Amino acid sequence: MSADVILYNQGVQYADGNIVTHAATYPASGSWTTGDIVLEQTSTTRLSGWKRITTGSGNVLGTDWVYCSNLISGTAQATTSGTSITFTGIPSWAKRVTVNFKGVGTSGTSNKLIQVGNGAVVNTGYLGSQSVISTASAASGNTTTGFAIASGAAADRLGGAYVLTLENASTNTWVCQGVTSASNVGSSFVTSGSVSLGSALDRINITTVNGTDTFAAGEINIMWE
């Protein structure tokens, strides 16, 4: 029995044992195709639908029914000067954003702070806490202006990651959890919490609680999916 796949634009073609694809005229823009999978030799028994082959936005494959995307990396930014580091251009379809720290240090003792935004950085309404765990002791606190990292020493050089996940798309509520460590003091810094935005997240800002300590070492990058 033959098992051919036949592609063509108009009309109907049947052949014994074949899988027949029938394509109509495609739209003028974008890379599209459409087709019917004929289950048997009658024009009424078919599965119809548009299929998007490429989206032009770096996706491995996108369709009208299933959205597939590769993990997309931002551009790493050096954390060697300034009071804040901002990443913009996060697409509205992103459901998870990871903030990666490598040897990040600041000039003072104010806790580091991760903030999200939608057109502008949001600095209110955060719920959660931050903790430091060291070989000698443990301590915790909470901050409402962002997801705080309880590293309070200028000598600390933080490495690790914090993951933000979309918990509720209808309210644009994001949750955060993650940990970094400072090998110079044998401490780990654990952060968790949530925040609701008025619209889709499009940026991440990293600063300090007092807003005046400057970055002095390392780099930060983000990834989204």
Where in the sequence are the language-model features?
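Short, charged beta-turn/beta-strand-edge "cap" motif at the junction between a beta-strand
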Residues: 43-46
